[in-house]
């Protein structure tokens, strides 16, 4: 029988970034503090030790098995009076209670009902939603109060809906068991199948688990007053189609007490996200191995102590930082639950609603631009223009930093010079945190940020992939921002932004440069080698006066040309930065040695194949 609840307005509270930090697949050694500005001394924190082997990154066979036996399953037909055909479940008016392990096929519609799973702690329950429509006025539509694990399977060809009310609270449970989602589980929760599920989390979250939340298939449309998908211990997604609109975080894992939990791992799926706060927020690690992720609106895109991008396609439009690696003690906001903990790795290697972002700003428009591999056109750049879509990119091969089996790299980036600064790079920032890391091993990544494009309070490692950043136009942020070192050993990068706090890489086995060059939204930005052959290009999404470039074809000590709207700037690429500092001074000399600027009204490179990164 459904417990009665007192009605209480359930308004979303301002989200604070709480972070503990873990490192996915990294060993444990401290990161050297880089040089800092003479007027501001860098401080660096040391985190706790962890072992990636302790993290459960896998999917069980049962997670991925959406099959069921229709003949032996108990059939539940919803309505004003529910009907149960089989054992293990009972009906009380419109409400249904499941008390035994087994498979239950749920169909029909109920305007005020709850499906309650209350089983023994070792029971596994499979709920097959086959055109089920459940709305509950005083609690979750589906509430797994107790079980070992619950599997929610979306039957082939089915269309399902679950919704809760705008406000409710429990009166006969302690607060620790209060359900906080339209589909809520106290136990591990797995969703699979090929059908569709629409979730309206009118009170708080859309889909939530106090343990693991695993999704291996299905099509999901989630609207939530707070978070869209939340798995306290972890969120793991193998496949699916997702449209998530949330007032706070779209996808979140919030365990800040266990160094092996609190992570998000995405292995596939097609994602469209509109979030009032973070698109993906993990207390420890965020890992993207595959999938097509489009974040149309957010405050910050990917946020965790450590962010690993190993593949897939990422497109993020953010009103603050697009990617942010920060621990609890170094993130920009905290709440009472913040323990301020952090974890080490081996470096060898605000309420919102409507269309406003977390900072109250209208989200920037999705930029248009080319995103292709380094060009293979003829040396005179005469091949025809083959523009691509905004967020797609040509196929590429990761030459360095490839991680076997799509696991995070074992801190394989190259360490930076202790006084690495601007080529235009920066040494160490204030509040540097050695536990924080952004590591890019593959994939196609396009970022449009009003704040920093990538902000790591620790290190940044680019080992492969294609990275395009349309950074800030304000002087207080940069396309790249890091606290200790930034290294590049592979991949392709074009990062455009303002020069006020600009940083480039601190070192790498692949040559790079920061170039002082200005352009406007819509301008074609082209990198040419000494023979005039285009090696990379992109169409700017917004104004900029600084560019950081690096491709697999660039060599240390070799001269290149950056062409912006017919204006050419020559520069020399290097594998090391040339001066220390906080990164607040703009491009460094090595990144643009005695640049020779010229105006060329006939930009032949505009006729070459599109490409950047």
Model-predicted regions and their roles:
Residues 2-613:
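A composition-driven surface/loop motif
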């Amino acid at each position: 029988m459904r417990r009665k609840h007192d009605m209480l307005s359930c308004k979303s509270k301002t989200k604070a970034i709480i972070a503990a930090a873990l490192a996915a697949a990294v060993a444990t050694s401290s990161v050297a503090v880089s040089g800092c500005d003479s007027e501001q001394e860098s401080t660096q924190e040391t985190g706790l030790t962890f072992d990636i082997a302790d993290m459960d990154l896998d999917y069980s066979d049962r997670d991925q098995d959406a099959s069921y036996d229709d003949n032996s399953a108990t059939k539940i037909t919803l309505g004003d009076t529910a009907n149960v055909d089989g054992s293990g479940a009972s009906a009380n008016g419109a409400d249904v209670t499941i008390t035994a392990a087994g498979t239950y096929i749920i169909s029909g519609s109920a305007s005020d009902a709850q499906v309650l799973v209350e089983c023994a702690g070792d029971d596994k329950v499979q709920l097959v939603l086959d055109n089920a429509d459940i709305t509950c006025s005083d609690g979750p539509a589906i509430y797994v109060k107790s079980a070992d694990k619950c599997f929610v399977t979306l039957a082939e060809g089915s269309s399902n809906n679950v919704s809760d009310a705008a406000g409710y609270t429990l009166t006969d449970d302690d607060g620790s068991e209060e359900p906080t989602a339209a589909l809520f589980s106290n136990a591990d929760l797995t969703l699979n199948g090929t059908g569709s599920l629409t979730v309206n989390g009118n009170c708080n979250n859309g889909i939530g688990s106090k343990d693991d939340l695993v999704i291996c298939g299905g099509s999901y449309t989630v609207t939530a007053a707070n978070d869209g998908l939340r798995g306290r211990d972890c969120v793991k997604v193998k496949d699916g189609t997702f449209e998530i609109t949330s007032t706070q975080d779209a996808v979140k894992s919030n365990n800040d007490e266990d160094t092996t939990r609190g992570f998000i791992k995405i292995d596939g799926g097609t994602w469209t996200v509109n979030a009032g706060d973070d698109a993906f927020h993990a207390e420890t690690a965020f890992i993207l191995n595959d999938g097509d992720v489009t974040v149309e609106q957010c405050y910050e895109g990917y946020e965790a102590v450590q962010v690993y991008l190993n593949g897939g396609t990422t497109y993020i439009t953010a009103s603050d930082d697009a990617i942010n690696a920060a621990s609890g003690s170094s993130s920009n906001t905290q709440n009472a639950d913040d323990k301020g903990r952090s974890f080490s790795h081996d470096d060898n290697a605000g309420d919102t609603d409507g269309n406003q972002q977390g900072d109250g700003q209208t989200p920037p428009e999705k930029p248009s631009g080319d995103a292709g591999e380094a060009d293979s056109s003829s040396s005179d750049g005469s091949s025809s223009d083959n523009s691509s879509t905004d967020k797609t990119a040509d196929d590429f091969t990761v030459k360095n930093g490839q991680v076997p089996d799509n696991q995070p790299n074992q801190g394989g980036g190259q360490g930076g010079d202790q006084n690495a600064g601007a080529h235009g790079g920066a040494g160490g920032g204030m509040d540097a945190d050695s536990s924080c890391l952004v590591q890019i091993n593959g994939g196609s990544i396009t970022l449009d940020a009003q704040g920093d494009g990538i902000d790591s309070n620790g290190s940044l490692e680019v080992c492969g992939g294609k990275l395009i950043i349309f950074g800030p136009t304000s002087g207080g942020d940069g396309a790249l921002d890091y606290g200790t070192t930034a290294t590049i050993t592979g991949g392709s990068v074009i990062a455009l932004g303002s020069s006020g706090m600009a940083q480039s890489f601190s070192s790498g086995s692949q040559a790079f440069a920061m170039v002082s060059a200005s352009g406007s939204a819509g301008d074609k930005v082209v990198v040419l080698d000494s023979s005039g052959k285009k090696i990379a290009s992109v169409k700017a999404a917004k104004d900029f006066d600084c560019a950081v470039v690096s491709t697999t074809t660039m060599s240390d000590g070799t001269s290149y040309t950056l062409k912006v709207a017919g204006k050419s700037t020559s520069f020399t690429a290097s594998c090391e930065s040339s001066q220390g500092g906080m990164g607040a001074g703009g491009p460094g000399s090595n990144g643009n040695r005695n640049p020779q600027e010229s105006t060329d009204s006939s930009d032949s490179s505009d006729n070459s194949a599109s490409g950047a990164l």
